[in-house]
Amino acid sequence: MQPVCSLVYSLGIASEFAGKRVGATRIYSRLFLISYLSRLLVYSSTRLLVYSSTRLLVYLSTHMIFLPEHLPVAAELRAAGFDVADYPSSGQERARRVLLLNLMPQKLVTELDIARTLAETGQAVHLTLVRLPGQTFKTTPMEHILQFYRELTPEMLAEADGLIVTGAPLENIAFEEVRYWQLLEQAMDEAAARRLPVLYICWAAQAALYHFYKIPKHPLPRKMFGVFEQKVLQPESAAMQGLAPAFPMPNSRHTEVRRKDFPADSGLQILCESEESGIGAAFSEKNNATFIVGHLEYEPFTLHNEYLRDLAKGLPIQPPLHYYIGAPEAGRPDYTWHAAAVRFYANWLDACR
């Protein structure tokens, strides 16, 4: 593996973002090509990964991601050139210990998205897959769950540096009617009591905002579907470092939270917002929790695949907005959110100390 390829890759990512205002319809064809081709060629353990919208800084890293032994997505990451180690393994004691509470039905897809994005930050991460006690699943073989997922316990939360809670396709169900709601509430309360850094994604963000602040979710007249420019409202916040003045973020949801429902005395900070898609992310200093309603972890073709899936089911769906290069039929996504995803997750990992 040649470090120069990694440098080209990193410069490609940084160039996608540095010094440009990220418009939702802007095409980054040349810069995306640099980033994409370099990513296909090689990933080195030496990466330049610190950048901002106004300057480019050099940071060399020799870290890797630690995953459960024989986890299928580990092989995919290795094939893409990522530095992946099975645990237990030497060096893992210096890695950030992150728990992934994966509530999505297609668990392997989400495992890959999260693991890939964490690996792209260049920081050493020990990722543990967890599930709520007694949870069973219909769409992922239980053999996979029993082999790779551990039941979440208070002791695990006490030892962790951070927790990621994914979304779930439960938007049309009242929170209290979700079969594992009480178990999820217990986990959220335990993490908040320890001030463990938690990243709540999409439905989980709405669920946590409802649990802690009674902020309701509101149904949308049609699916919020596409890549939407987020205006950074708190550029000085740790989560938004290097993302101002704006960045693109994929959204795929049927409900939303609204600014008017945020209690004035909650201490919640709205970090970013979109004229089209509404509130993008918020932060609670009290609970040390970040709530993001979009999916920066998505790989380039996720929205396209969701679009084809909904079409095949005969569901009312429009092509994802601000996403395709050319006509939707060509199926050419514009991966404009890649740099923002790496930066956002790097910022969050920095808080996991």
Identify the role of each PLM range.
Residues 1-4, 10-11, 16, 40, ...:
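Short polybasic linear motifs
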Residues 19, 29, 34-36:
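Generic detector of N-terminal low-structure segments
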